[in-house]
Amino acid sequence: MDTAVVYADLHLARTGEPKHKSPPSLSPDTCQCPRWHRLALKLGCACLILLVLSVIGLGVLVLTLLQKPLIQNSPADVQENRTKTTDSPTKLKCPKDWHSHQDKCFHVSQAPNTWNKSLADCGGKGATLLLIQDQEELRFLRNLTKGKDRSFWIGLNYTLPDKNWKWINSSTLNSDVLSIFGDTKQNSCASISQDKVLSESCDSDNLWICQKELKCECMCNGS
């Protein structure tokens, strides 16, 4: 009798103990990914980020290169460019005692002489007797010689058998540019005064005007 009671008490005590909860079972439709799948996904994301950063960096590099010269100059090329820049013409300049106007230099003689000797003097200076281009140039020359009460030989004479006024460069006088006053005959040469272009004997003594083209004056190394 006592033994039965003890057995019953032990049975009740065991059945009253709390039961451990088991984890909920997954439904058959749920897919549980293995751990290496998750690791592969993380690595893929990291690679994608690195790829995007690489593309951005490459784009910046390309833009930087495009802003630079395609070919870098060698030291020899740099020196050559400096030499060209230094030796480049800086201005147009006439010789001393010559006067510049437009693209010409003019020289006025100080002592009178015949037309032929005046022509030879200009040739010795590497120039020619004056060849008047237009009325504007004639006005400049009259201002240049203003105050000198003399006429000035120019490179124009009367030629036979053509019976024409010709410049020493063989071109014929344009009467719209100059009108000649005075007798026109053999051995006639032209001179300019403050108000006229005169026909005179080539053996007369006059001052004269030489002309030459402007030349480039270069500023070179060591000058």
Curated annotation (Swiss-Prot):
SUPFAM superfamilies (alphabetical): C-type lectin-like
Distribution of this protein across tissues and organs: Expressed in a subset of natural killer cells.
Membrane topology classification: Single-pass type II membrane protein
TM ranges: 46-66
Cytoplasmic face of the membrane: 1-45
Cysteine disulfide partners in this protein: 122-210, 189-202
Broad class of where this protein is predominantly found: membrane
Topology feature Extracellular, residues: 67-223
Cross-referenced Pfam families: Lectin_C
Listed InterPro entries: C-type_lectin-like, C-type_lectin-like/link_sf, CTDL_fold, KLR_subfamily_B, NKR-like_CTLD
Signal peptide: none
GO cellular component: cell surface; external side of plasma membrane; plasma membrane
Location(s) in or outside the cell: Membrane
Residue ranges of the motif ITIM motif: 5-10
Gene3D superfamilies linked: Mannose-Binding Protein A, subunit A
GO biological process terms on file: natural killer cell activation; positive regulation of natural killer cell mediated cytotoxicity; regulation of natural killer cell mediated cytotoxicity
Domain C-type lectin: 101-211
GO molecular function: carbohydrate binding; identical protein binding; protein homodimerization activity; signaling receptor activity
Source taxon at top rank: Eukaryota
Motif (LCK-binding motif): 31-34
PANTHER family, sorted: KILLER CELL LECTIN-LIKE RECEPTOR SUBFAMILY B MEMBER 1 (PTHR46784:SF1)
Subunit and interaction comment: Homodimer; disulfide-linked. Interacts with tyrosine kinase LCK. Binds PTPN6/SHP-1 in a phosphorylation-dependent manner.
Domain notes: Contains 1 copy of a cytoplasmic motif that is referred to as the immunoreceptor tyrosine-based inhibitor motif (ITIM). The phosphorylated ITIM motif can bind the SH2 domain of several SH2-containing phosphatases leading to down-regulation of cell activation.
Known function: Receptor for CLEC2D/OCIL. Ligand-binding contributes to inhibition of cytotoxic natural killer (NK) cells. May mediate MHC class I-independent 'missing-self' recognition of allografts, tumor cells and virus-infected cells.
Name listed for the protein in its UniProt record: Killer cell lectin-like receptor subfamily B member 1B allele B
Upper classification of the organism: Eukaryota, Metazoa, Chordata, Craniata, Vertebrata
